[in-house]
Amino acid sequence: MPQMAPINWLILFIVFSITLVVFNILNYFCFFYTPLKTSQSLNIKFNKLNWKW
């Protein structure tokens, strides 16, 4: 069974690296973050305590 030539491994590594970088760039820049309205959705009641020492 013949082995792959080193230039073939190099091309395979370069293609894999370029694919990985392009995939990561597309995932990073194509992410649309839509934050929820935190003031309306969260109703947190705070108890204001006046400490008398």
Curated annotation (Swiss-Prot):
Subcellular location as annotated: Mitochondrion membrane
Q: Name one Pfam family in it.
A: ATP-synt_8
Q: Which domain of life is it from?
A: Eukaryota
Keyword annotations of the record: ATP synthesis, CF(0), Hydrogen ion transport, Ion transport, Membrane, Mitochondrion, Transmembrane, Transmembrane helix, Transport
| A Gene Ontology molecular function term of the record | proton transmembrane transporter activity
Q: Kindly state the subunit structure of this protein.
A: F-type ATPases have 2 components, CF(1) - the catalytic core - and CF(0) - the membrane proton channel.
Q: What is this protein called?
A: ATP synthase protein 8
Organism of derivation: Anopheles gambiae
